[in-house]
Amino acid sequence: MKLRQLEIALQRCAGFERPRASREQYQTPATLAARLLYDAFVSGDIAEKTVMDLGCGTGILAIGAALLGAREVRGTDIDPEALRTAEKNAALLGADVTFIAADVGSTEKIDPCDTVVMNPPFGAQKQNIHADRPFIDCALAIAPVTYGIFNAGSTAFVEAYIAGRGNITGRVAGTFSLKRSFTFHTRDLQEIPVEILRIVRA
């Protein structure tokens, strides 16, 4: 499957029915999800691999990994409603994905894998400052390779945070197209600069 084909397929995924601002529940744009997944695919980190989507939300990254030929794909999220939507999305696209209700703060229900893909919270809400740290910690604990979406300019922070535990071996700039989802949003569409980081466990 080519990049454009993947993007078109992922555009069919439904978003959150009732998104919660406190959890920064924003649907990962299909263009950005496809870019992350295709970079991972070209690097040999998807096909025939066991892939985990941490904080999978409605499942777009997990589903894309399955469409690119991952041997086994699992997605985990704390929100049961989001997981129900993820299951519907997977069925719609014929993707074989196992979705699990679990908190990334505890790895008891999260088995080791070859590759983690994730779009962790950016910590934009006051109550969510550093909300991406548990995701990074969990990813390093369960997989040798991680691909994550972070706010532009986060590379230095991530490098310092994972020092001695992992290294950033790839970085791709991108844009997160954020549609108006909550009353505090002042624009119908906001383009947020982001970066996709490839992290390899030390």
Language-model-derived ranges and their functions:
Residues 1-202:
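Class I S-adenosyl-L-methionine-dependent methyltransferase catalytic core
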